[in-house]
């Protein structure tokens, strides 16, 4: 199974492509970020996100997409903007006939570290360790995208797994 993990954002969207044959061993295919300039109109930023994601999907041919669920408590403007980016991401995946699975930050933390209240540093160290990377992927959004992809692989291989496709 090849999973495209995504940590959505308008300024920066992290992505990571991971492959697993048995649900416990991981092979990193690629990871990186899609950046948009704040000097562009929002519509142009969303278009850039769309075209870059289309290229990534075309190049790496993932089987499924795992995306981090939106969680904000205070800044509604940020939540709306990220919601718009998520909409573009979900539409792009649907247009490419990809199944999409969402995971909360709590689910990702629990899956990767075994502790639902793990902090960013703990998650990043586990991502580095589990993927056999020489350094922690930067920026944080990229490490988060890899963590979401691993979360899907680990969750889907669990006997407790319940399919929760978007």
From Swiss-Prot:
<keyword id="KW-0378">Hydrolase</keyword>
<keyword id="KW-0479">Metal-binding</keyword>
<dbReference type="InterPro" id="IPR012337">
    <property type="entry name" value="RNaseH-like_sf"/>
</dbReference>
<comment type="subunit">
    <text>Homodimer which binds Holliday junction (HJ) DNA. The HJ becomes 2-fold symmetrical on binding to RuvC with unstacked arms; it has a different conformation from HJ DNA in complex with RuvA. In the full resolvosome a probable DNA-RuvA(4)-RuvB(12)-RuvC(2) complex forms which resolves the HJ.</text>
</comment>
<feature type="active site">
    <location>
        <position position="7"/>
    </location>
</feature>
<comment type="similarity">
    <text>Belongs to the RuvC family.</text>
</comment>
<dbReference type="GO" id="GO:0008821">
    <property type="term" value="F:crossover junction DNA endonuclease activity"/>
</dbReference>
<dbReference type="GO" id="GO:0006281">
    <property type="term" value="P:DNA repair"/>
</dbReference>
<dbReference type="GO" id="GO:0048476">
    <property type="term" value="C:Holliday junction resolvase complex"/>
</dbReference>
<dbReference type="Pfam" id="PF02075">
    <property type="entry name" value="RuvC"/>
</dbReference>
<dbReference type="GO" id="GO:0003677">
    <property type="term" value="F:DNA binding"/>
</dbReference>
<feature type="active site">
    <location>
        <position position="68"/>
    </location>
</feature>
<dbReference type="InterPro" id="IPR002176">
    <property type="entry name" value="X-over_junc_endoDNase_RuvC"/>
</dbReference>
<keyword id="KW-0233">DNA recombination</keyword>
<dbReference type="GO" id="GO:0000287">
    <property type="term" value="F:magnesium ion binding"/>
</dbReference>
<feature type="active site">
    <location>
        <position position="141"/>
    </location>
</feature>
<dbReference type="InterPro" id="IPR036397">
    <property type="entry name" value="RNaseH_sf"/>
</dbReference>
<feature type="binding site">
    <location>
        <position position="141"/>
    </location>
    <ligand>
        <name>Mg(2+) 1</name>
    </ligand>
</feature>
<feature type="binding site">
    <location>
        <position position="68"/>
    </location>
    <ligand>
        <name>Mg(2+) 2</name>
    </ligand>
</feature>
<dbReference type="InterPro" id="IPR020563">
    <property type="entry name" value="X-over_junc_endoDNase_Mg_BS"/>
</dbReference>
<dbReference type="GO" id="GO:0005737">
    <property type="term" value="C:cytoplasm"/>
</dbReference>
<keyword id="KW-0540">Nuclease</keyword>
<keyword id="KW-0238">DNA-binding</keyword>
<keyword id="KW-0234">DNA repair</keyword>
<comment type="function">
    <text>The RuvA-RuvB-RuvC complex processes Holliday junction (HJ) DNA during genetic recombination and DNA repair. Endonuclease that resolves HJ intermediates. Cleaves cruciform DNA by making single-stranded nicks across the HJ at symmetrical positions within the homologous arms, yielding a 5'-phosphate and a 3'-hydroxyl group; requires a central core of homology in the junction. The consensus cleavage sequence is 5'-(A/T)TT(C/G)-3'. Cleavage occurs on the 3'-side of the TT dinucleotide at the point of strand exchange.</text>
</comment>
<feature type="binding site">
    <location>
        <position position="7"/>
    </location>
    <ligand>
        <name>Mg(2+) 1</name>
    </ligand>
</feature>
<protein>
    <recommendedName>
        <fullName>Crossover junction endodeoxyribonuclease RuvC</fullName>
        <ecNumber>3.1.21.10</ecNumber>
    </recommendedName>
</protein>
<dbReference type="GO" id="GO:0006310">
    <property type="term" value="P:DNA recombination"/>
</dbReference>
<keyword id="KW-0460">Magnesium</keyword>
<keyword id="KW-0227">DNA damage</keyword>
<keyword id="KW-0963">Cytoplasm</keyword>
<keyword id="KW-0255">Endonuclease</keyword>
């Amino acid at each position: 199974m090849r999973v495209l993990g995504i940590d959505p954002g308008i300024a920066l969207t992290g992505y990571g492509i991971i492959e697993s044959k048995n649900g416990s061993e991981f092979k990193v295919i690629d990871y990186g970020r899609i950046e948009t300039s704040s000097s562009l109109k929002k519509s142009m930023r969303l278009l850039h996100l769309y075209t870059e994601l289309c290229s990534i999907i075309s190049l790496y041919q993932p089987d499924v997409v795992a995306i981090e669920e939106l969680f904000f408590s205070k800044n509604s403007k940020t939540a709306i903007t990220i919601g718009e980016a998520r909409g573009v991401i979900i539409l792009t995946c649907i247009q490419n006939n990809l199944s999409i699975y969402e995971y909360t930050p709590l689910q990702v933390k629990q899956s990767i570290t075994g502790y639902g209240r793990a902090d960013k540093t703990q998650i990043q160290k586990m991502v580095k360790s589990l993927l056999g990377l020489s350094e922690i992927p930067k920026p944080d959004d990229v490490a988060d995208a890899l963590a979401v992809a691993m979360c899907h692989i680990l969750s889907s291989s669990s006997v407790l797994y319940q399919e929760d496709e978007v």
